[in-house]
């Protein structure tokens, strides 16, 4: 009987330890996961142009100008391209489109097609850009061009979006926000023209995915 009683005590101690150590282990794991998430995020500022950046960062005018010019070049390479001005205006609004440089990412056959139909192809103006904090350290900083539509019918209306259609909120420069580091990664060059309304569809899909991800995160945190 004593032996049996000893076995029962041992089982109880093991069971108690398992029940009480498991939450601790989970908590430690959660802390490391949260730390990993924090490291994967980056604080960025949103500016309309180099002057906005310089005003917010006195003494950093040269860096602001460099970031702005780099963002313009990136916009030429990655912005949605349209075969006609009308298609671009339908998406982004009057006065928001420009002729794109022939070498701006487009494949030669698509350049020829666009040039045959209208003499050139079109892209939206860069409405602003995201820029990593100047005091963030490391070898320089990253920037990402942003676009915005002035057509109320477009899903991108009044919003800052990147070339992939991801939404970064209201098109109001001067804001600071936290984004995943992947948001600042260079986007692939645009190699084909977009049909009318195609970019808006991308923005709508991205917004749906963002809302879904936010909802899942909220439910997970709430248990």
Curated annotation (Swiss-Prot):
InterPro entries: Biofilm_formation_YgiB. Residues 178-223 are annotated as: Disordered. Residues 204-223 have a biased composition (Polar residues). Residues 178-195 have a biased composition (Low complexity). It comes from the Bacteria. Belongs to the UPF0441 family. This is UPF0441 protein YgiB. It comes from Salmonella typhimurium (strain LT2 / SGSC1412 / ATCC 700720). The gene is ygiB.
């Amino acid at each position: 009987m004593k032996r049996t009683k000893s076995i029962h005590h041992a089982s109880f101690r093991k069971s108690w330890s398992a029940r009480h150590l498991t939450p601790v282990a989970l908590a430690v794991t959660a802390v490391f996961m949260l730390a990993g998430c924090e490291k994967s995020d980056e604080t960025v500022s949103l500016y309309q142009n180099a002057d906005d950046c310089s005003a917010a960062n006195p003494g950093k005018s040269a860096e602001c100008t460099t970031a702005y010019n780099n963002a313009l070049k990136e916009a030429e390479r990655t912005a949605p391209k349209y075969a006609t001005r009308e298609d671009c205006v339908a998406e982004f609004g009057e006065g928001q489109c420009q002729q794109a440089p022939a070498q701006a990412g487009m494949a030669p056959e698509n350049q020829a097609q666009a040039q045959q139909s209208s003499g050139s192809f079109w892209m939206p103006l860069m409405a602003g850009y995201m820029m990593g904090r100047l005091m963030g350290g490391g070898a320089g900083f990253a920037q990402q061009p942003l676009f915005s539509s002035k057509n109320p019918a477009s899903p991108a209306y009044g919003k800052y979006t990147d070339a992939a259609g991801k939404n970064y909120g209201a098109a109001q420069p001067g804001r600071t926000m936290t984004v995943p580091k992947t948001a600042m990664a260079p986007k692939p060059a645009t190699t084909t023209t977009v049909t009318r309304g195609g970019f808006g569809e991308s923005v709508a899909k991205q917004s749906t995915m963002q809302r879904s991800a936010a909802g899942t995160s909220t439910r997970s945190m709430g248990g």
